[in-house]
Every structure is written in structure tokens, then in C-alpha cells.
Amino acid sequence: MMLSSTSLYAAIDLGSNSFHMLVVREVAGSIQTLARIKRKVRLAAGLDTQNHLSQEAMERGWQCLKLFSERLQDIPLDQIRVVATATLRLASNAEEFLQTATEILGCPIQVISGEEEARLIYHGVAHTTGGPEQRLVVDIGGGSTELVTGNGAQANILVSLPMGCVTWLERYFSDRNLAKDNFDRSESAAREMLKPVAQRFREHGWQICVGASGTVQALQEIMVAQGMDELITLAKLQQLKQRAIQCGKLEELEIPGLTLERALVFPSGLSILIAIFQELAIESMTLAGGALREGLVYGMLHLPVEQDIRSRTVRNIQRRYLLDTEQAKRVSKLADNFLLQVEKEWRLDSRCRELLQNACLIHEIGLSIDFKRAPQHAAYLIRNLDLPGFTPAQKLLLAALLQNQSDTLDLSLLNQQNALPVDMAQHLCRLLRLAIIFSSRRRDDTLPAVRLRANGETLYVLLPHGWLQQHPYRAEALEQESHWQSYVQWPLLLEEFN
């Protein structure tokens, strides 16, 4: 069956560092990514002191757009949005570039204001990023930095500042020297630019801070490569700065997890981010699921911003893989009941509760491939599917839980994830496995009144007197489960009460 072009949408962002194109297909009220194309054009590097854009920089941009234009030919014009940001807002000869660019693409290009850019970034984050409703969004681009606070779908404070990782690179690291002096000057200039707006942001407050740029993506990749958790903090940023200073020169910058492509603008982006953390008194930051391009696409689709993006993602997976939602709810409800019984002893919090519920709601996804090795298939799918609202670390945890939902346990998977402390992840795994065993008859009226009691790592499963004898299938499964858990030093004791 041919893919209907009417369901295709494209968003192009002519940024100061890179040009990006996102092509998506609308599927049942959400988007499926078909193509993401990114080319480092470094347009901002072509600006001289008079803000005149060099011929070479324009040529780099046009070459990239020729590549994009072929992909756009199958998409209806009213389903394409092309925007230009900081450098083309600033360039005195922007019109010359835009005229040729419009001819190449065959569709209009809109040079958007910094405030409109901030609004679109926030819109993209609101559609793709989970967590609390009240958020601060930070996007460090090539030529500008956007700061936005908002609640749910509504942006409140929108600020765009003329500092970016390309302009700061040319201004403070032009000698390609990673000396402390260069970092100090770069940070100091960024802090001066932030001072007029910082207090307003601090007074407004937020529950979660989200980063939506290549700099933040690079930091995330570095942290994952080094086995850290995914929360970005000022201490980690300072640590990375020291590491960069030790490297001495930009061409010698080597940090595990930092790609060659991102290395050039990494020190300048890092110094801007450090200044933002200091001036706005940010405690921690996570990576956004989307930003400007997603904001453009969702704007064309007119889809409402859901209160809980993770729930929407889980529902879409259940629909797409034809999961038995009744059974998923049954397992989820039982696992939740188990968690509430042991949460004090095991110090399980609301994060644990939500992640356990999500694991339960999609635990049978592996069956859509085959019953044999279903847990492994489930883990593979969860690791590789696009899951809006879930961070990379949360995806790894869900995959680890699903791979360990039955049979022998592989603790290395739970130890390698960093969404939760290892002991919490292990405790969730134990509860998930028990909920699946007790729900195996797939009927509500067969669930016993199970009581759980935890004492350190020992877990007591208390059942009504005679239940084990009357239910030999599940009794055997529980006996086997007790052995499997004991192999990894998780004592599981079955007892009956009158």
C-alpha cells in the first residue's frame, strides 16, 4: 500500500549551527518519525563584525537545502513549515540568502522572532517530554539561547538572548585554546547577558528544568558513556569543564561519549550552560524529548497537549501491538497493591510507582513477536521504540524490568540502568514478577488476598490457608520463583495465614 502524502508533514529549522529537517507521518493522533536529517552548516560562523553573511556560509546553506528539497517534493505545501532563526534575524544581507533558499525549497521561509522561537520550543517540549507540569525550558542554539517557563501547554515567560554556541566559540575560543581564562571570559559574558532576566525566572519558579539543545544532548551522551545518572547538575558541568581545560586545545578535546561532530561547539555551549545554572540557581536538568521542529509539526497537526505524555505513549503502544489491556491493568493494579504494602520498608517513591505501572501496562509486548523469548523481545522493542515522555535512562530501566519479568534473572541489566538506584530497580523487578504470576489466570475472580511483608531483602508472601494446595499451577510457579530469586540472594518466603 502506498503511503498517503496527505498524512506526511515536514518541519525545517535553518539554525545558526545546523540545518535540520524532520519528516513525520500522523498516526492515530500522534507522530511517527520517518526522517531526521541534520547538516552542520555553521551559518553564524559566516557573520562578520558588520553582521554581513559571507558567500561561503550562504553556499553551505544552499547546498544543504538542495538535499532537503528532494525529500519535500512528496509532501503537500501546506504541511511544510520552514523557519529561520538567530543568524538570519541578524544578517544584514539575509534577504539575498532567503531569496535563493526559497527558490531551492519551493516553499516560503519564515524568519521568526526570538520570542516566537521560544514559544515553538516550549510547544515541542510540552508535546514530547514527561514529568511535572510546571517547567523551565532552556535551549542553547548556535546564535541564540531561549529560556521559557510554562505550565502544561501554556508558556508564561519567553526570553531569547543573542548568545549561542557558535557566536561564543568565535568570540571567546577563536584561538581554539581551552584555557581557564577563555572559559572565565565566556561564562562572565553569558552571566552578564542573563542578569537582566534571571531574577524574574527565579521568582517565577519551576518544578522541573528541561534542556532542549545539542549541548544538553552531548552532555547526556557523555554521562551515559561514563555510567553516570542522566541528571545534569552544576557539579557535573564543572567537572567536565576541568576535563576540557586539561585537554588544552580544541582539536585535542577528547571526552568519552563526546562525538567529533559536537566537540567544536561543546566548550562554548558548556560555558553558557554553566552561566545559566549559576544565574538561575538551577539544581538539575534533564533532556527534552523534542523542541523547535516538534513544536512546528504539532502546531500544524493542531493536536492538544496531553496532561500525561507517558500515558499517551503507553496507550499508543498497547494499540499498536494489540496488547490485552484488561490483563495489563490487572497486573498493574496488583503490582501497585504490592508496592503500597512494602513502600515504607523498601523506601519506594512516586517515581518507582509510576515506572512499575508503566512496565506492567506493556509487559506483554514481546508476545507480538513470539512466545519464545518474549521477555527478550519486549526489552529489545522498548530499547528501540521512540517513547515520547520517557528519558533514555527510563527506557533502559523499563527494558531491564521487562527482560527480567520471568525465568532466570540477569541482574547486570538492572545494575547498568541509572534511572533509579539499583536496589529500588531490583525491588520493582521482584514485585512485577510476583504480580505476573498471581495474574496468570487472566481473571479478576482468581486473585487471592495476598499480603506482602518486607524485612530488609527478605520478602514474605502471605496467602490464605489452603490456597497453595487448591492452586497447584500457581503454587508451582511461586515455588520456582522462590528458587530463582534465591539464586540472586533475594530471599522469598511463602507462608499461609488463617
Swiss-Prot record:
The keyword Ligase does not apply. InterPro entries: ATPase_NBD, Exopolyphosphatase, GppA/Ppx_hydrolase, Guo-5TP_3DP_PyrP, Ppx_GppA_C, Ppx_GppA_N, PyroPPase_GppA_Ppx. Keywords: Hydrolase. It comes from the Bacteria. Pathway: Purine metabolism; ppGpp biosynthesis; ppGpp from GTP: step 2/2. Coiled coil: none annotated. GO terms for molecular function: exopolyphosphatase activity; guanosine-5'-triphosphate,3'-diphosphate diphosphatase activity. GO terms for biological process: guanosine pentaphosphate catabolic process; guanosine tetraphosphate biosynthetic process; nucleobase-containing small molecule interconversion. It catalyses: guanosine 3'-diphosphate 5'-triphosphate + H2O = guanosine 3',5'-bis(diphosphate) + phosphate + H(+). Its EC number is 3.6.1.40. Pfam families: Ppx-GppA, Ppx-GppA_III. Catalyzes the conversion of pppGpp to ppGpp. Guanosine pentaphosphate (pppGpp) is a cytoplasmic signaling molecule which together with ppGpp controls the 'stringent response', an adaptive process that allows bacteria to respond to amino acid starvation, resulting in the coordinated regulation of numerous cellular activities. Belongs to the GppA/Ppx family. GppA subfamily. PANTHER family: EXOPOLYPHOSPHATASE, RETROGRADE REGULATION PROTEIN 2. This is Guanosine-5'-triphosphate,3'-diphosphate pyrophosphatase. It comes from Yersinia enterocolitica serotype O:8 / biotype 1B (strain NCTC 13174 / 8081).
